[in-house]
């Protein structure tokens, strides 16, 4: 069993602090309870997150509950909408991620996870 899934960032400082403590990879999925496209990939994302090795930290963030972090990343053109998953490699302590997935294409989602995990 991997690390517990993070479900909330109080603010962007807490988010950036998590990057400094990156165990190997960090995946952050941004979505919302009301988001229909988010629901389309929810099971696939959960399956991937639950099968991660111990050096991968995952977060499932509701944009309505972590608005500071989402708005900050959106202002930097990191996220354009939801669902979006961003990936940070160990050593990247900057807000710009190493890889990004946005949308609902399940094949592209699987390729995104494979591509990121190949960097471990």
Task: Annotate each PLM feature.
Residues 1-26, 59, 107-120:
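N-terminal leader/targeting and pre-domain segments
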Residues 6-10, 30, 42, 46-70:
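Thiol-based oxidoreductase modules, predominantly thioredoxin-like and allied folds used
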Residues 14-50:
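Local sequence-structure signature of Cys/Sec-based thiol-disulfide redox active-site neighborhoods
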Residues 15, 27-28, 58, 85-87, ...:
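Structural signal for hydrophobic/aromatic residues that build the beta-strand cores
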Residues 17-19, 70-77:
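Short amphipathic alpha-helix with an adjacent loop that forms part of the alpha/beta core around
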Residues 31, 61-64, 88-90, 104:
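Structured beta-strand/turn binding interfaces of compact recognition modules in eukaryotic regulators
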Residues 36-37, 67-69, 94, 108-110:
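Eukaryotic short linear interaction motifs
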Residues 80-120:
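Non-catalytic, surface beta->alpha helical segment in thiol-disulfide oxidoreductase systems
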């Amino acid at each position: 069993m991997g690390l517990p899934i993070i479900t909330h960032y109080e603010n962007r400082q807490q988010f950036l602090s998590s990057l400094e403590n990156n165990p190997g990879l960090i995946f952050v999925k941004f979505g919302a309870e009301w988001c229909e496209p988010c629901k389309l990939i929810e099971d696939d994302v959960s399956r991937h997150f639950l099968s991660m090795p111990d050096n991968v930290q995952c977060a499932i963030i509701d944009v309505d509950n972590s608005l500071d972090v989402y708005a900050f990343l959106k202002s930097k053109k990191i996220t354009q909408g939801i669902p979006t998953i961003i990936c940070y490699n160990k050593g990247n302590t900057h807000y710009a991620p190493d890889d990004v997935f946005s949308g609902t294409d399940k094949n592209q989602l699987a390729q995104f996870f494979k591509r990121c995990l190949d960097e471990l």
